[in-house]
């Protein structure tokens, strides 16, 4: 797993599932800020959040996702084929991205 931060624009929140061990999996369709490629992202969130927080994600232009990226063989194959990518990301924090000039982030939720 690689620790990293993603700056993405949320295009669509497809689904929210709760697993048996109380984790939440959110399927998002997003676009990276520096690239125009569309990405399907699975966010694994260890603490349960209310649906209102996920509705807030759609309202923001860009968000910063902090956590660890899980690599798998299917991800590597899709990267080589240059198609829509699927990423699985363990989330520790999600920030609202304002502007680099204001240099302020608002913490939405913390692990």
UniProtKB/Swiss-Prot annotation:
What PROSITE patterns does the record point to? SSB (PS50935)
Give the domain of life: Eukaryota
**Does the record carry Metal-binding as a key word?**
no
Gene3D superfamilies documented for this protein: Nucleic acid-binding proteins (2.40.50.140)
The answer to whether the entry has keyword Chloroplast is yes
What are the alphabetically sorted keywords of the record?
Chloroplast, DNA-binding, Plastid
- Where does the UniProt annotation place the signal sequence? none
Q: List, alphabetically, the GO terms of the cellular component aspect.
A: chloroplast
GO terms assigned for molecular function:
single-stranded DNA binding
The record's annotation in InterPro entries points to: NA-bd_OB-fold, Primosome_PriB/ssb
Protein's cellular compartments: Plastid, Chloroplast
Residue span, SSB domain: 1-98
Task: Report what the protein is called.
Answer: Putative single-stranded DNA-binding protein ycf41
Q: Which gene is the coding source of this polypeptide chain?
A: ycf41
